[in-house]
Swiss-Prot record:
Recorded superkingdom: Eukaryota
Signal peptide (from-to): 1-46
GO BP terms, alphabetized: adenylate cyclase-activating dopamine receptor signaling pathway; adenylate cyclase-activating G protein-coupled receptor signaling pathway; cartilage development; cellular response to glucagon stimulus; embryonic cranial skeleton morphogenesis; embryonic hindlimb morphogenesis; endochondral ossification; energy reserve metabolic process
Compositionally biased tracts (Basic and acidic residues): 86-103, 200-211
Biased composition (Basic residues): 227-237
Family annotation (Pfam families): NESP55 (PF06390)
Record-given protein name: Neuroendocrine secretory protein 55
Miscellaneous comment text of the record: This protein is produced by a bicistronic gene which also produces the ALEX protein from an overlapping reading frame.
UniProt entry keywords in alphabetical sequence: Cleavage on pair of basic residues, Cytoplasmic vesicle, Glycoprotein, Proteoglycan, Secreted, Signal
Lineage, uppermost ranks: Eukaryota, Metazoa, Chordata, Craniata, Vertebrata
GO MF entries: adenylate cyclase activator activity; adenylate cyclase regulator activity; alkylglycerophosphoethanolamine phosphodiesterase activity; G protein activity; GTPase activity
Ranges of Acidic residues composition bias in the record: 104-139
């Protein structure tokens, strides 16, 4: 009975449920639930995407601003250096223009006199260098005279007198060198070589000893008569190269036990 009553109760409950919520209504309710949940999820995803995009845009704007500020600072540092370098170049360009003196206009006669006066000291310097080189080539016996140098600023009649004195000194130095050359040339005497190898060179009277002038020629004659004797060569002793060979003193004694 209990089982039947329970089955009846379940059937009644189902019928009551179906009456209250028919199957069509139940399916519609489930579909609405799914739709509402999906819509809520989509909205959440959309909001999260929007927030992520906003954050990315903020980061980009911040980075761009930072890079722009760094570039502006670098440009600001480069610009003053370039401006300073340009100002330095301008100063350098201005300085040579200021340093150039204004050339005054002279006549041609003034230029000619200046060139003539410049050529005179050059000729004096050349003559002085010639005089200085000649005494170095002369021998030590000849007295060397150093030319007196005069300042280049003194010009006029003194130059002619100086040239005359230089020519006189040159002439005197040439004469002294001509006198010294024959003194240096001395006759060189060469000793006559012996004609034959066997003959001994004859000694002069100066080589002889004054103590015994009579004994020397006799000794020389005896030496010439006696033939030269060669020294006898002693036979070299041979040694045994083998270290094991016994000495040649006598027979080796044999011991018998």
């Amino acid at each position: 009975m209990d089982r039947r009553s329970r089955a009846q109760q379940w059937r009644r409950a189902r019928h009551n449920y179906n009456d209250l919520c028919p199957p069509i209504g139940r399916r519609a309710a489930t579909a609405l639930l799914w739709l509402s949940c999906s819509i809520a999820l989509l909205r959440a995803l959309a909001s999260s995407n929007a927030r992520a995009q906003q954050r990315a845009a903020q980061r980009r704007s911040f980075l761009n601003a930072h890079h722009r500020s760094a570039a502006a600072a670098a440009a600001a540092q480069v610009l003053p250096e370039s401006s300073e370098s340009e100002s330095d170049h301008e100063h350098e360009e201005v300085e040579p223009e200021l340093a150039r003196p204004e050339c005054l206009e002279y006549d041609q006669d003034d230029y000619e006199t200046e060139t003539d006066s410049e050529t005179e000291p050059e000729s004096d310097i050349e003559s002085e260098t010639e005089i200085e080189t000649e005494p170095e080539t002369e021998p030590e016996t000849a007295p060397t005279t150093e030319p007196e140098t005069e300042p280049e600023d003194e010009r006029g009649p003194r130059g002619a007198t100086f040239n005359q004195s230089l020519t006189q000194r040159l002439h005197a130095l040439k004469l002294q060198s001509a006198d010294a050359s024959p003194r240096r040339a001395q006759p060189t005497t060469q000793e006559p070589e012996s004609a034959s190898e066997g003959e001994e060179p004859q000694r002069g009277p100066l080589d002889q000893d004054p103590r015994d002038p009579e004994e020397e020629p006799e000794e020389r004659k005896e030496e010439n008569r006696q033939p030269r004797r060669c020294k006898t060569r002693r036979p070299a002793r041979r040694r045994d190269q083998s270290p094991e060979s016994p000495p040649r003193k006598g027979p080796i004694p044999i011991r018998r036990h």
